[in-house]
Swiss-Prot record:
Pfam families: GndA. It is found in: Cell inner membrane. Keywords: Cell inner membrane, Cell membrane, Membrane, Stress response, Transmembrane, Transmembrane helix. The chain crosses the membrane at residues 28-50. This is Protein GndA. Induction: By heat shock (shift from 30 to 45 degrees Celsius) (at protein level). GO terms for biological process: cellular response to heat. It comes from Escherichia coli (strain K12). It is a single-pass membrane protein.
Amino acid sequence: MLLLIPSNHISIKETSSLMVVTPSSRTLFVVIVSFQQRALTSSVPVFLAVKRGR
């Protein structure tokens, strides 16, 4: 399952916290670190790629 979540620089923090607090799937692959820094520099909506494996 591949989820694309459009989020702002503020939403990224909320999303990252939720992902860390909610380990529902066996494998959770989240790409935030690189996008976080970019989002902080520019207030452009960033797409978070969340790969969940059943």
